[in-house]
Amino acid sequence: TFKTQEPQYMHLLTTSKNFNASCDLNQGLNHSNIIFIMVQTPNSGGTKFYDHSIVSSLLQEINAKKVKNKHIVIGCTLMPKYIDEVGIFLLEDCENTTLSYNPEFVAQGDIINGFLNPDMVLIGTHSVEVGCILQNIYNKIVTNTPAYCVMCPLDAEITKITINGYITTKISFANMISDVCDEVGADKSVVLSAVGSDSRIGTKYFKPGHS
């Protein structure tokens, strides 16, 4: 059963003619030569930051089936060097199979809109073919004209973490200024709006309490 408060989600789910859910890994692997992996990689704290145990376990399951001629694409957040130094070796028994990185940039409460209208699509791959395939897939899905940033997996892993870190820092800074305003009696909305009007800063993710 799929239930969520995400806008547009239930409408798309109930009107889709092609969506098919299954708990059978074989069915998923046999359905297409392009396999997207979207699982949790929660922040684990410490020096590793992101917990790769779930995605690694899934790659090991796929490897045990010795699939051939597949393009496997990981869409969850990874630490730098995971694709090249961990993930690809977990698929060592999969003949003619590539492993690439295509993380999403969406926020809860705006997932569908963010997916359909991305500012950019980040693709980390060593395969020119995969880069072209993914761009063609997105061109059929998105409703805008995003920038396609195609690079090696390591560069893409660092790009994803950099963007996440920058947005988190911007939100934290806005909340810090909000606290200062509350302490001295200033209007935090007026202050942050004025600061955000500077094109070098911008108002996105720069509002009191924004998370």
Spans of features found by a protein language model:
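Structural/interface elements that position substrates and couple domains in central-metabolism enzymes
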Residues: 1-211
